[in-house]
């Protein structure tokens, strides 16, 4: 249920960002997070993952979205910790590609592609949770 909710919330954020555009400050922060994620280990990756998804919602300018995310963060973070522990190099690379794809698609105003990357991301998360 939480994964499904997060998927819908983030797709809504993508739709808003496609209309409004990604603000310059948030672009820089996205790029910093993504660059740091490339060399992250399993101890630092969960926090960076949370930072990325929080930034996605924060960039919309909709404080209620961030508040809702914070409310479910503890439950979801436990799942992400499990996923990260189960993640091999291939899955880590795929997750990184999906994060980068979400941001790049939004920066280029390609809404459909951003939504596909969100779906791909959560499909992989759900697959990893089933293992």
PLM regions and their residue ranges:
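Exposed, interaction-prone assembly regions rather than primary DNA-binding/catalytic cores
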Residues: 17-31, 35-37, 41-45
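Exposed alpha-helical structural elements
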Residues: 1, 25-32, 64, 101
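C-terminal all-alpha effector/ligand-binding and dimerization domain
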Residues: 31-34, 38-39, 47, 51-53, ...
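Short, solvent-exposed positions on alpha-helices
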Residues: 24-28, 43, 47, 63-67, ...
């Amino acid at each position: 249920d939480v994964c499904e909710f997060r998927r819908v919330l983030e797709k809504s954020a993508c739709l808003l960002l496609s209309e409004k555009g990604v603000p310059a400050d948030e672009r820089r922060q996205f790029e910093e997070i993504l660059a740091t994620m490339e060399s992250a280990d399993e101890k630092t990756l969960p926090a960076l993952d949370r930072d990325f998804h929080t930034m996605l919602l924060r960039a919309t300018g909709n404080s209620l979205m961030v508040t809702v995310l914070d409310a479910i963060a503890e439950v979801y973070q436990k799942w992400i910790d499990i996923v990260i522990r189960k993640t091999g190099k291939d899955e880590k690379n795929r997750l990184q590609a999906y994060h980068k794809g979400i941001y790049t698609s939004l920066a280029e105003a390609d809404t459909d592609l951003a939504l596909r990357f969100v779906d791909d991301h959560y499909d992989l998360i759900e697959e990893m949770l089933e293992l």
